[in-house]
């Protein structure tokens, strides 16, 4: 069976679900069990190709005398060997399409990225910034000052040629980036409420931290209309429609060579890039304290990862348009979906000894390491105190959340148990009163009556026995 598909294939032409213990949120999957060359591990093939490549470099290629070049090439070769090992030997995750090796590759990239972050963390601030020159010589230079915010008029009457120039100036490449980003985040989280909460809370964070990072300073309509309603809102809406289609889709798979028509073969190839099966996420944060804290933790990590994007660029002197910034976003898009599925399975697992998935573990470690780099490289910026009115707002919000948590999971349960006990007592008293009015003894009266009758019977028996003895004598 294919690696990464956690199901047992039925026989050829089988039309029964593959997983008997399927959850109610999981779709039914039908598979003919075809195992082709595409799905095999190819561990020996990869080892042979890797050995040939290393042998060619060692025996046939002349080693350059450039120390810096050799160092870079040695590091890249070491990473490639590790990726080859991981792609063929690492443990499969929950996803298997388009191929399990694809997700094993991103798992290994996560390890490499975390090791890179650890290396940067252990350098001095100056050495860490200058080390990035080995990646790109244009890095390691302080970022130029930029003007953010500016004129926030939607209609600028002073500009006769184009009074809406402020709006057109905001329509840059970040608009489609926001839309695509939130479309993909919705596919990861699979919940409208959580997506909207994260979207709105991040705008509040931008308001709160604009005294630390100048690029957080935006116009009000850029925050709430362009970002929340248009870009983020439209991306979330399209993502929810895609989730609806995926949850209703029939997951029935056949081997490519078992499909008779060319149109069917092309359709099968296209559907190779869709999920093998589908699980609808039901987070249910208010169902228990455990799930409530877990959902709050997920939202916190999401917001922290978003903030790290901006703070890392600031402390490591990376321009927003640099390709490393884009590569980091692509990385999180690929690993985020796997991590969310593993977290959901971890929360939904009924076993007493649960284990967090490997990709979720790495994503959490990466997010924390990025935060530590920001704290070490620019503590002055992070320690700039919040304005008083902003700190008051966050304090009030925290108190409200804490109060609701205590009421929902502690006081409410105690109150409900107390009311239920009172209700049962009242019903018992009412039933006893009704029985007494009807002339029937209540439960306690029955017990008392039985005890009296037994005592009387015992007394009468004793008297009868005494009388019988007297008569005999």
From Swiss-Prot:
Membrane topology: Multi-pass membrane protein
Top EC group: transferase
Residue segments, region Disordered: 1-25, 422-473
Any one Pfam family match given in the protein's UniProt record, by short name: PSS
Modified residues (Phosphoserine): 12, 14, 16
E.C. code: 2.7.8.29
GO process annotations (BP): phosphatidylserine biosynthetic process
Pathway: Phospholipid metabolism; phosphatidylserine biosynthesis
Residues in the Cytoplasmic compartment per record: 1-40, 96-104, 313, 376-381
Function field: Catalyzes a base-exchange reaction in which the polar head group of phosphatidylethanolamine (PE) or phosphatidylcholine (PC) is replaced by L-serine. Catalyzes the conversion of phosphatatidylethanolamine and does not act on phosphatidylcholine. Can utilize both phosphatidylethanolamine (PE) plasmalogen and diacyl PE as substrate and the latter is six times better utilized, indicating the importance of an ester linkage at the sn-1 position.
PANTHER family hit by this protein: PHOSPHATIDYLINOSITOL SYNTHASE (PTHR15362), PHOSPHATIDYLSERINE SYNTHASE 2 (PTHR15362:SF7)
Record-stated family: Belongs to the phosphatidyl serine synthase family.
Name of the featured protein: Phosphatidylserine synthase 2
Gene behind the chain: Ptdss2
